[in-house]
């Protein structure tokens, strides 16, 4: 199902006496006497954070999670970040989750944060990574992943509700291994913004909390006290900041009930399984395997990659100029949402890498309007791109020629933040970590579980991740996964004096990359169902014919210098397959009643193989979608609160195909 994307309405700010005032809520963001001192008193001291941080274990797998109901100027986040780096153990990690229905535009944010020069170091980084304000989730990493921010743009209840597994208070706590440690209830006053202080929101907050979870807010409203008490929190009154008489602190004790109408059968998640050690085996050394290895190693896990070839970055990940670009749409569906979230996150990841490594270029790419259908699709984006010009710009024939550096026959969609990345080199960089071991020439034909660890080719680990592309369904446990092989061949040709003027990737029916080492890479064929990467001259000619149609006025060399073929793995819905692997027979038995009612509440988690995960089927957009998917998966394995909403976790879940079969029949 799809519906139109509803754009975010940014904050309407009026500056009064050099202070930001919200016209939407008829309230001030902070008072003249407030700001940092108020944040320190209310939220940091109100949650006893510094003392709690100093008692944390000193390992990278430990994550302290703070959740906030209103991001506003970001000052609470920046102050927390600064204090975390000063008082928390060096290896511990902070996950800060926040939400805003009407976020500040970047210019307004800069003006607000200029008031606090003591936060200038953190402010500069936040401004650099401040996201395009599209609806949904944005995940940002700072301080080499020691600080992460999940910024959710939209209604606060809807956003936080999506962090729940099922919405049933009893089952939620049985399933949940990750909780919020401290809450900052910070929004405009209850009389101005009632949705920020609703009973329903506090019920969700309770389901994301455990007995040690604390809450702090500047408010002492009876509405807030009652809502927190009803949700299972014990209230502690404290003197308010400055002239305020009181503020509220609280700690979670026990929630008593939840709404039955908001329950969702948790078919996508399994009951927690003990992990004796923080060790992981990854089958497959392509982009997916290397990214998940990197994400786990950053969390202190010992990782071993088993790769069939002689090195990582082979097979479908061997493209030396892979193109990064989004799939933009005015319609909101699991596919378009996942593609947008993934592109924005991947772009941030690659920009950081390019500061240190010569891996490629992010100077933009051009999607040509090469036929009427593509032209109509691009024209449908006009309003969306007016709101979000950072995502793309529609250009005419003259502009496309100027942007690309060569004569082109049509206009198109210019994606300013896209470009190309050398995938094999990226794989090498990702596994350059003392916690990652690589074993090459290791073909995996079976996997075994010994009631404690997974054993593959006499190597064992507590967690097993299958990231082996089209071969992911070769095992007994995975043979129900509907993965299809798609062969693609790239052709390398000599550059000419004229063709070297090409500055950015061009994409149409095929695509061509700017010259690198006096040659262009042109591609790519798309052979569904072909699982063998044999090279053939017919595909070279197909690529050259498409190249002529992309830029017919340019004299392209017909001299084929080299060619390469890889096998993409894709799912029927072209979303990746990422998450815990269900036992197919048990799944069908437990959820058989979904056939008569797909929304039926079944109070059972998915029957999954213990600590066995899939990370595959990224198709032709792996460079775009793998970074976010693997970061989410690493967080799940490491018992962290999700950086993806439930609806997208379900959209990429390995269990979705079994559920669909139950509902629709064979």
UniProtKB/Swiss-Prot annotation:
SUPFAM superfamilies assigned to the protein according to its UniProt record, in alphabetical order: FAD-linked reductases, C-terminal domain (SSF54373), FAD/NAD(P)-binding domain (SSF51905)
GO annotations of cellular component type: cytoplasm
GO biological process: methylation; tRNA wobble base modification
Cofactor names: FAD
Domain of life from the UniProt record: Bacteria
UniProt keyword annotations, A-Z: Cytoplasm, FAD, Flavoprotein, Methyltransferase, Multifunctional enzyme, Oxidoreductase, S-adenosyl-L-methionine, Transferase, tRNA processing
Stretches for region FAD-dependent cmnm(5)s(2)U34 oxidoreductase: 283-666
Pfam families the record matches: DAO, Methyltransf_30
Location of region: tRNA (mnm(5)s(2)U34)-methyltransferase: 1-253
One Gene Ontology molecular-function label: tRNA (5-methylaminomethyl-2-thiouridylate)(34)-methyltransferase activity
Main location: cytoplasm
InterPro entries in UniProt: FAD-dep_OxRdtase (IPR006076), FAD/NAD-bd_sf (IPR036188), MnmC-like_methylTransf (IPR008471), SAM-dependent_MTases_sf (IPR029063), tRNA_MAMT_biosynth_bifunc_MnmC (IPR023032), tRNA_MNMC2 (IPR047785), tRNA_S-uridine_synth_MnmC_C (IPR017610)
NCBIfam families assigned: MnmC_Cterm (TIGR03197), PRK01747.1-2 (NF002481), tRNA_MNMC2 (NF033855)
Purpose of the protein: Catalyzes the last two steps in the biosynthesis of 5-methylaminomethyl-2-thiouridine (mnm(5)s(2)U) at the wobble position (U34) in tRNA. Catalyzes the FAD-dependent demodification of cmnm(5)s(2)U34 to nm(5)s(2)U34, followed by the transfer of a methyl group from S-adenosyl-L-methionine to nm(5)s(2)U34, to form mnm(5)s(2)U34.
Protein family (similarity comment): In the N-terminal section; belongs to the methyltransferase superfamily. tRNA (mnm(5)s(2)U34)-methyltransferase family. In the C-terminal section; belongs to the DAO family.
Protein name, per record: tRNA 5-methylaminomethyl-2-thiouridine biosynthesis bifunctional protein MnmC
Source organism (scientific name): Legionella pneumophila (strain Lens)
Taxonomic lineage of the native organism: Bacteria, Pseudomonadati, Pseudomonadota, Gammaproteobacteria, Legionellales
Name of encoding gene: mnmC
């Amino acid at each position: 199902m799809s519906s139109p994307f509803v754009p975010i309405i940014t904050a309407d700010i009026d500056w009064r006496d050099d202070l930001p005032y919200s016209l939407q809520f008829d309230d001030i963001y902070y008072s003249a006497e407030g700001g940092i001192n108020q944040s320190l008193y209310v939220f940091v001291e109100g949650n006893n954070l510094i003392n709690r941080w100093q008692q944390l274990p000193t390992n990278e797998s430990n994550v302290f999670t703070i959740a906030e109901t209103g991001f506003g100027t970001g000052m609470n986040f920046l102050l927390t970040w600064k204090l975390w780096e000063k008082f928390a153990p060096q290896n511990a990690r902070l996950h800060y989750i926040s939400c805003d229905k009407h976020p500040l535009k970047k210019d307004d944010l800069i003006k607000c944060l200029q008031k606090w020069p003591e936060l200038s170091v953190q402010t500069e980084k936040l401004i650099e990574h401040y996201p395009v304000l599209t609806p949904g989730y944005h995940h940002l990493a700072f301080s080499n992943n020691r600080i992460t921010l999940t910024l959710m743009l939209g209604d606060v209840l809807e956003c936080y509700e999506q962090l729940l597994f099922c919405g049933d208070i009893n089952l939620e706590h049985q399933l949940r291994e990750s909780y919020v440690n401290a809450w900052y209830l910070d929004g405009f006053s209850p009389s101005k913004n009632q949705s920020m202080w609703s009973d329903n929101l506090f019920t969700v907050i309770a389901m994301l909390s455990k007995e040690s979870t604390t809450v702090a807010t500047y408010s002492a409203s009876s509405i807030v006290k009652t809502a927190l008490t009803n949700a299972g929190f014990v209230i502690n009154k404290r003197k308010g900041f400055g002239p305020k008489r009181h503020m509220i602190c609280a700690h979670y004790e026990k929630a008593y009930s939840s709404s039955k109408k908001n329950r969702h059968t948790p078919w996508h998640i399994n009951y927690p399984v003990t992990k004796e050690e923080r060790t992981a085996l990854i089958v497959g050394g392509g982009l997916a395997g290397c990214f998940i290895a990197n994400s786990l190693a950053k969390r202190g896990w010992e990782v071993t990659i088993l790769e069939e070839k002689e090195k990582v970055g082979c097979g479908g990940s061997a493209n030396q100029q892979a193109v990064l670009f989004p799939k933009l749409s005015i319609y909101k569906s699991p596919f378009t949402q996942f593609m947008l979230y993934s592109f924005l996150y991947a772009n941030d990841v690659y920009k950081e890498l390019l500061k240190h490594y010569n891996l490629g270029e992010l100077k933009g790419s051009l999607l040509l309007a090469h036929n009427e259908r593509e032209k109509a699709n691009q024209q449908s984006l006009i309003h969306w791109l007016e709101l979000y010009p950072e995502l793309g710009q529609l250009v005419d024939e003259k502009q496309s020629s100027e942007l690309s550096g060569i004569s082109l026959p049509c206009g198109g969609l210019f994606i300013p933040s896209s470009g190309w990345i050398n995938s094999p080199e990226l794989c090498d960089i990702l596994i350059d970590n003392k916690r990652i071991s690589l074993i090459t020439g290791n073909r995996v034909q079976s996997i075994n579980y010994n009631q404690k660890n997974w054993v593959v080719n006499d190597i064992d680990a507590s967690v097993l991740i299958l990231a082996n592309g089209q071969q992911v369904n070769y095992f007994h446990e995975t043979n129900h996964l509907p993965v299809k092989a798609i062969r693609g061949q790239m052709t390398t040709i000599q550059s000419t004096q004229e063709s070297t003027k090409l500055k950015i990737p061009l994409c149409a029916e095929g695509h061509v990359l700017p010259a690198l080492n006096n040659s262009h890479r042109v591609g790519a064929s798309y052979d569904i169902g072909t699982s063998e990467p044999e090279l053939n001259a017919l595909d070279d000619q197909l690529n050259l014919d498409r190249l002529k149609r992309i830029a017919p006025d340019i004299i392209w060399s017909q001299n084929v210098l080299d060619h390469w073929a890889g096998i993409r793995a894709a799912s029927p819905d072209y979303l990746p397959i990422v998450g815990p692997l269900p036992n197919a027979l048990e799944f069908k038995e437990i959820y058989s009643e979904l056939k008569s009612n797909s929304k039926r509440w079944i109070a059972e988690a998915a029957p999954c193989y213990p600590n066995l995960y899939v990370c595959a089927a990224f198709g032709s957009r792996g460079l775009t979608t793998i970074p976010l998917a693997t970061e989410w998966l690493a967080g799940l394995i490491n018992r962290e609160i999700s950086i993806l909403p439930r609806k997208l976790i379900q959209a990429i879940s390995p269990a979705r195909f079994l559920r669909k079969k139950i509902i629709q029949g064979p």
